[in-house]
UniProtKB/Swiss-Prot annotation:
The gene is Mrm3. It is found in: Mitochondrion. It comes from Mus musculus (Mouse). Residues 65-85 have a biased composition (Polar residues). This is rRNA methyltransferase 3, mitochondrial. Belongs to the class IV-like SAM-binding methyltransferase superfamily. RNA methyltransferase TrmH family. It catalyses: guanosine(1370) in 16S rRNA + S-adenosyl-L-methionine = 2'-O-methylguanosine(1370) in 16S rRNA + S-adenosyl-L-homocysteine + H(+).
């Protein structure tokens, strides 16, 4: 009996402990749910105020007006730095950018986008030399962002009248610059009009009766190099047909090395209006560096070989869907092929340079046929697809310059004999 009694008392003890634990937890929950009233209304009508515990004291709300007032005061603290500083040496005034100034970023957003550039009529020029060349050619400046005042002092003072001068940190210029080593000055100019520009007299003295037509050139580096070659050869004008990369894109400007302000450039020209930009009696020649002509250039039996080169020569992705091979062969303009080193400068000439991706357009061949022009062959060795567009343009332009120089020398020699 002792053992069962002992087991019964142990079970009863454990049960009591469980009941006590549950009762303790219940009391804790009840204590947590109890709330002390803030005010007590007695039957007599008296109100008794109860004091809150320290942890129950209400927090003071921060008034919104004070935070707004602090926000409104922040620009006022930086307003003294917006006061224009006077440049006493030339009587010009410049602004010093204040923290959070967005004038530079807003302008850069416009001039670095082609649609915005064309809509706003503004371009970006970077570097002291390029800016000086633009001012010398008659470009109209709108604003200059610079990190040191000495950079502005190097520019012609008479060209800086009514121009916004804003001094910014060099880090801000570096963030927006396309150069590896920024020069600390950026200029915003109105998009130049070739009719109103005053180009340097020395290049004009050596100008040739030679016009360059760029057809669907899309690589900025190639176009900048071509413009540089055109300025060096002495072209009278450069026409960029619709579809070419913008001549005023920063990469083209960087590759051009100032050629934009040494030769007139007409941008975004429709093929229907190209003859309006050419001198009277101009013959249009098309650059042809297709290797298939290297062996048949002087032969009269071009036939199928002409067509083999034409398929790579033209951008037929727009036309070949609805035409079979025979129809296209009859439809193509018939142009005579001539070696580039033979005389082709007897009359005013225009040279068409096509892009490397699609070649020249059908419109260029039709214009060449209507003006009595030819294909100028640059022979390359078998296995080589073609030359770089900038290289082909340089070869033809300087060959034309050589031929014209020989004509001038022969003419002066004949006059000396008489």
């Amino acid at each position: 009996m002792a053992a069962p009694a002992k087991g019964m008392w142990c079970s009863l003890g454990s049960l009591l402990r469980v009941v006590q634990t549950r009762d303790l937890n219940a009391r804790r929950w009840v204590r947590a749910l109890r709330r002390s009233p803030v005010r007590v209304l007695s039957p007599s009508g008296q109100v008794e105020e109860r004091k809150r515990a320290p942890d129950q004291q209400p927090r003071k709300a921060v008034p919104k007006a004070s935070s707004q007032g602090q926000r409104q005061k922040q620009p006022l603290e930086t307003s003294p730095s917006q006061t224009p500083h006077t440049w006493e040496e030339a009587g010009l005034r410049y602004d010093k950018a204040f923290p959070g100034d967005r004038r530079l970023s807003s302008v850069m957003t416009i001039v670095k986008s082609r649609p915005f550039r064309e809509k706003q009529g503004k371009i970006l020029l970077e570097g002291r030399r390029l800016i000086a060349d633009a001012l010398k050619a008659g470009a109209v400046p709108k604003a200059f962002f610079f990190s040191r005042l000495e950079y502005v002092k190097e520019l012609p003072v008479d060209k800086l009248k009514d121009v916004s001068l804003i001094k910014v940190k060099f880090e801000d210029i570096k963030d927006w610059s396309d150069l590896v080593t920024p020069q600390g000055i950026m200029g915003i100019f109105a998009k130049p009009d070739p009719v109103k520009m005053t180009y340097p007299e020395t290049p004009l003295h050596h100008t040739l009766p030679l016009v360059l037509i760029c057809d669907n050139l899309r690589d900025p580096g190639n176009l900048g190099t071509i413009l540089r070659s055109a300025a060096g050869a002495g072209c009278s004008k450069v026409l960029l047909t619709k579809g070419c990369v913008d001549a005023w894109e920063p990469k083209v400007l960087r590759a051009g090395m100032g050629a934009h302000f040494q030769v007139p450039i007409v941008n975004n020209v429709e093929w229907e209006t190209v003859p309006n930009h050419l001198p009277p009696d101009t013959r249009v020649y098309v650059a042809d560096n297709c290797g298939h002509y290297a062996q048949v250039q002087m032969s009269d039996k071009t036939g199928d070989r002409d067509w083999a080169c034409d398929r790579r020569f033209l951008k037929f992705h727009k036309y070949e869907e609805d035409l079979d091979t025979k129809t296209r062969k009859d439809w193509l303009p018939k142009l005579e092929v001539q070696s580039y080193d033979l005389d082709w400068t007897g009359a005013p000439a225009a040279v068409v340079i096509g892009g490397e991706t699609h070649g020249v357009s059908l419109e260029s061949l039709q214009l060449a046929e209507s003006t009595g022009g030819k294909r100028l062959l640059i022979p390359v060795v078998p296995g080589v697809d073609s030359l770089n567009s900038a290289m082909a343009a340089s070869i033809l332009l300087f060959e034309g310059k050589r031929q014209l120089r020989i004509k001038v020398e022969d003419l002066s020699r004949d006059r000396s004999y008489h």
